[in-house]
């Protein structure tokens, strides 16, 4: 049903970029799209020019552990990136993943999609946006 619905949505809104997002099963038990390989298989099966991946680096770290390796495999089909600190979904400024290096990689690769933060700030949001620069 998921594939049929996505196929319909992609055909219904051909000028819109649609995304699907793998989410780790620890944070969202029972969520069926909890694997990047499965997400890429879905994109290949539907083969719609307006259907892309939403790459959440936090979920990649929780699902696979190898964020950069996963990114290399999926970047050609990615339209939107989300970031959040690993392992606690805090600001993407510390923790178990080197976000500054990842952002440099995105710049070097000339990534043209969206990058957004999805995390729980330690304090006021305005005080915790240094990662953007």
For each predicted feature, which ranges?
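Distinct, well-ordered alpha-helical segments
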Residues: 28-46, 61-75, 93-96, 125-132
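Active-site-proximal loop/turn and secondary-structure-junction residues that shape catalytic pockets
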Residues: 22-26, 57-59, 85-87, 119-123
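Hydrophobic faces of well-ordered beta-strands that scaffold small-molecule active sites
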Residues: 18-20, 51-55, 79-83, 113-117
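Structural motif corresponding to the early beta-alpha repeats
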Residues: 1-4, 99, 112-122
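Short glycine-rich, flexible loops that bind phosphorylated cofactors or substrates
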Residues: 90
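Active-site acidic/histidine proton-transfer and metal-coordination neighborhood
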Residues: 1-52, 62
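Aromatic-rich peripheral "rim/lid" segments of glycoside hydrolase catalytic domains that contact
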Residues: 105, 109, 120-133
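Acidic (Asp/Glu)-rich catalytic clusters
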Residues: 7-15, 43-47, 69-78, 100-111
């Amino acid at each position: 049903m998921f594939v049929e619905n996505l196929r319909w949505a992609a055909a219904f809104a051909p000028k819109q970029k649609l995304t699907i997002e793998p989410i780790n099963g620890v944070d969202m038990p029972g969520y069926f799209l909890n694997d990047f390989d499965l997400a890429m298989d879905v994109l290949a099966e539907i083969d719609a020019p307006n259907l892309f991946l939403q790459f959440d680096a936090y979920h990649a770290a929780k699902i696979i552990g190898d964020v950069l390796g996963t990114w290399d495999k999926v970047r050609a089909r990615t339209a939107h990136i989300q970031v959040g600190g690993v392992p606690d979904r805090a600001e993407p400024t510390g923790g178990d993943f080197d976000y500054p290096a990842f952002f440099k990689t995105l710049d070097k690769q000339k990534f043209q999609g969206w990058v957004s933060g999805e995390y729980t700030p330690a304090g006021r949001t305005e005080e915790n946006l240094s990662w953007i620069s």
